Structures are given as structure tokens and as C-alpha cells.
Amino acid sequence: MLTAFARAFKTPDLRKKLLFTLGIIVVYRLGTHIPIPGVDYKNVQECVDQASGNQGLFGLVNMFSGGALLQITVFALGIMPYITASIILQLLTVVIPRLEALKKEGQAGTAKITQYTRYLTVALAILQGTGLVATARSGALFSGCTVAGQIVPDQAIFTTVVMVICMTAGTCVVMWLGELITDRGIGNGMSILMFISIAATFPSALWAIKKQGELADGWIEFGTVILVGLVMVGLVVFVEQAQRRIPVQYAKRMIGRRSYGGTSTYIPLKVNQAGVIPVIFASSLLYIPALIVQFSNSTAGWATWITKNLADTAATPHIILYFFLIVFFAFFYVAISFNPEEVADNMKKYGGFIPGIRAGRPTAEYLSYVLNRITWPGSLYLGLIALVPTMALAGFGANQNFPFGGTSILIIVGVGLETVKQIESQLQQRNYEGFLR
């Protein structure tokens, strides 16, 4: 692998892409520390110190922003508005015929959907920025902090508007940086920024576990967590690479004096076809009712029930509902992202067939059957990998922001593998050996 990295840097265009990507990452990390007007950062730091790693409701969003959310910086919202907008557009594509038609128009349609995603991202950034500022002003952002109500000293409307504008502009810059990486760098830009945001929280989270440990001054807990994390990474890599290959043959055809077809290939169906999307969907859904309770500041019976059973990640109802939501969204996302009828029609159009299966509708039914069977273990794996770390490592003072939690590991491994594969394909195009030998 080190040799492959060396070869990548020796290739001028690859070196340029890698250095460009690294430069954008540096700019992104610098942006997470740029303050916005109207915030007393001395009080913010005091509240962060008092939180002692227990960041409550905002932990997931804080992880995706690389810790910028609870610091209330320009990039406080991170890429979460863009992720949410992308998910909403994907869902709307299924139910709105106009968007579905755009998706089938190729590059022009994709560009139009991307434009809609940008508009929706800005709208969501304004909403989320307003919610964050309102929460910070009320003191609910750090509920256990003694100076939480003094984070935003100036309660004027103008100050609030300026803060929201700064956060929205920061989200637009993050979106632009991600698109720059996609166009001129290595890998998918938004995925790379998400990877960096999560990885940036690892050192402080690990050190917090060491400080909270009691055995051998915390080093036993620290080492155990590292070991468990490595085992989990290995497991996730194994499952993410696992796939069912459906053999496909193409009939030989004579057009003029030339022979076409007669080749064999396969359709790769991954065990985890949905990726990390079901986990993000489930987390977002469970986040909404708890957020409503926090904004309403209600003490009614329904609010108490939600706080006790849904907002608490260690509560049994939360764990059960979270697991079933992940399984449901795994099947749902696979259904909207992989169309067996479309695949079968394309195979039939170009003379392809699955050995032993008739072309057309029987092929689509066979693909649906295989996909359903392979999605079951994939969805159960997603649910377990998202829950087991929380339950098994509760004794180490871990919370929903634990660095080796299901969501973070799935994203880190998934993005890492895709980026390495892209570099590998670029190397192989230049007759070099890649990483995955």
C-alpha cells in the first residue's frame, strides 16, 4: 500500500488531485474554528468542558460537523443540511413523476436535480441555523451548564439574523468545497468531508474515555476500546466487501462481418446494498421528536415520555425502535435505489441473460428474489452494528458520540474503501498495481 501511495504521488495528475483534496480538507478544518459574531466563546468553552463528552441530542450533528456545532462556529451546521436535502430529494424522486423523469434524462437531468438539492440545502440551513441559535439563546444547547444562558449575550433580532446568515453562508461554502473535491480532487467530495468530520472527533473522544477510566489510570479501558474498534473495523470491511455475483451472459451476434457479444460478466449485489443511509434515516427520525421536546421546553406527560424513552439512547424503547427503523429503511432504500425491472430490460435490450432464467419478467422476479434474501442479513447487520457498540461499551462511559459507534465506523470504512478503490482504478489505468492486491 505504501508503494502504491508513492506511485500515486509520482504520477503528476494524481499528485495534483491528491494535493488539491488535502488543501480543501485543510480549508474545511480551518473553517470549523472560525467564530461568528454575537457568541461569548469563553462561556461556550466552559459549557463544553462541563459537558464532559455527554452532548445529548446534538451529538450526531456535532459528529458530522467535526465538533463545530457545539463550538457555534461558521461551519457549525457542517454538511448535515446537504445530507438531509439529498435524502429528501431521493425520496421525492420516487413519488413525484417530474423528478423521476429528470433522473432518466441523463447528465442534464442530474444537473437539474443537483440544483434543486442546493436550493433545498440553503432552505434547510436557514431553518437549522435558526433552531440552533434559538436553542443557544435559551440555554438548552448545554442543559447542564451554569452559564448556558449567557452564550449569546445580545438577544436582539439583528444579532440572531447575522448569526443565521453566517451559518447559512458557512453551509454554502462547505457544499462548494465538497463539489470542488468531486470535480477536481479524489473521491466524492461530501463523503470525504463527512469522513474528515468524524475522524476529527476520534482523538478527543478516545482521550475522554482514557480520562474516565479507572483501571491502570484508564489505560486498560483505552486499550480495550482500541482493540474492540479494530475488530469492528475488520468486521465492517469484511461485510462491506461481501457481494452476491449474479452471472450474466451475452449472446453472440453478427453485424456485418463483425461479431459482437459472447462475453460473460456478473451483476454484483452487495450484502449491505443500502450502505449507511438507513442508519442516518433512523437517527434523523428519532432525533425529531426529542428536538421538539427540547424546543418546546414542555413538562407535560408526552414530553416526559419522549425524553425518557426516545431521547435516552440507552432506553429499551429507543433501542428497539432504532433497530426496527434501520431494518425498515434498509429494505426501503434498496427498493428505491435498485430497480430489477430496469436492469432486466437493459439486459434484454443488449442480448444479456442469466443462465437458466428467461429474459424479461422472469429475470426481474429472480433479481427481486435474490435481492430480498440478501437484504435480510444486510439489514440485521446494520441494526446490530449500530446498536452493539452502544450497549457493549456503556461500561467505559461511552455515549452516542463514541468514536467506534456504528454510524461513524460504517461511514469511515465505506468512504475509505470507495476512495482507495478510485485511486486504485486510476493507478491501474496507468499500468500500476493498486492498493487492493
UniProtKB/Swiss-Prot annotation:
It comes from the Bacteria. The chain crosses the membrane at residues 19-39, 69-89, 122-142, 157-177, 189-209, 219-239, 275-295, 318-338, 378-398, 400-420. The keyword Lipoprotein does not apply. Gene3D superfamilies: SecY subunit domain. Signal peptide: none annotated. It is a multi-pass membrane protein. Component of the Sec protein translocase complex. Heterotrimer consisting of SecY, SecE and SecG subunits. The heterotrimers can form oligomers, although 1 heterotrimer is thought to be able to translocate proteins. Interacts with the ribosome. Interacts with SecDF, and other proteins may be involved. Interacts with SecA. This is Protein translocase subunit SecY. It comes from Streptomyces coelicolor (strain ATCC BAA-471 / A3(2) / M145). The gene is secY.
